[in-house]
A protein has these predicted regions:
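Short, well-formed alpha-helical segments that are part of the catalytic scaffolds
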Residues: 10-25
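A conserved acidic beta->alpha catalytic loop
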Residues: 35-46, 90-91
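Glycine-rich, basic loop-to-helix element that forms the pyrophosphate-binding segment
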Residues: 61-78
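Short aromatic/hydrophobic "clamp" motif used to bind/position activated sugar donors
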Residues: 83
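Conserved donor NDP-sugar-binding/catalytic core segment of glycosyltransferases
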Residues: 95-126
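Short, flexible, basic/aromatic active-site loop/helix in glycosyltransferases
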Residues: 114, 130-149
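A recurrent flexible, glycine/aromatic-enriched loop bordering the glycosyltransferase active site
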Residues: 140-159, 174-176
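Acidic donor-binding loop at a coil-to-helix junction in glycosyltransferase catalytic cores
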Residues: 176-183
Length: 216
């Protein structure tokens, strides 16, 4: 039924993964959570404790392959047709987060849940990224549905696995977020329906000013 796919890089994911597991168990469906670490230098000692959990597959890569390739690897290894992509630097503040996606399982549609940011200001060095996220990325579903393909992001995304037989994340793209833009264009070309719903997760991993400027 559901494969939850989380690429990890230098972020502690134990709490959010266990929350996802608890929500999936309440749905009473077959599920798996694939957590693939992209050769991180931090938090592996903590994250590896997920290996003992049922329905969770935690794997550490020997070499860093980048978020595009690791997403494609997660798709390849997923065993169910409903794929839920989540970034690792998140928190979930909705007890019905997975249940809100359930009506779209096996729909054949791509569904974007959206992103939110904490209301409290972060440290000064991260304030630019936070303001950008609050002003440019945090949009409700009605606004995103006005231009569904332009608003596409794989940060919080439900998609049927068979779509990836036609389209994959482009591994030649190295710019920040541009692989999502290109994937959205390909979805439009293939006539795949992209729907946006109000089911956001909170983005925690804010880059410092200089790093964010270099990425964009």
């Amino acid at each position: 039924m559901l494969s939850i796919l989380i690429p990890i890089y230098n972020f502690k994911v134990v709490d959010v993964v266990l929350e996802l597991k608890a929500q999936a168990e309440k749905l009473d469906i077959p599920f798996e959570i694939l957590c693939f670490d992209d050769a991180s230098s931090t938090h592996k000692d903590t994250n590896i404790t997920l290996q003992k959990e049922a329905n969770i597959q935690y794997r550490e890569l020997n070499n860093n392959i980048g978020r595009t390739k690791i997403r494609n690897l997660l798709v390849e290894k997923a065993k169910y047709n409903n794929l839920l992509f989540l970034d690792c630097d998140i928190t979930i503040n909705k007890p019905n987060f997975l249940a809100s996606y359930a009506p779209y399982f096996n729909s054949g549609h791509v569904v974007c849940g959206g992103v939110a940011y904490q209301k409290e200001k972060p440290e000064k060095t991260q304030e630019l990224r936070w303001k950008y996220g609050r002003n440019r990325e945090e949009k409700n579903a009605s606004l995103r549905n006005q231009s569904p393909y332009q608003s596409f992001t794989a940060f919080n995304l439900l998609a049927p696995k068979d779509i990836f037989q036609k389209i994959a994340f482009n591994e030649k793209i190295i710019g920040y977020g541009h692989e999502d833009t290109l994937f959205g264009i390909e979805l439009k070309k293939e006539g795949v329906t992209v729907a946006h719903i109000d089911n956001p997760i909170i983005h925690l991993g804010l880059d410092e000013h200089q790093v964010f400027i270099e990425k964009t």
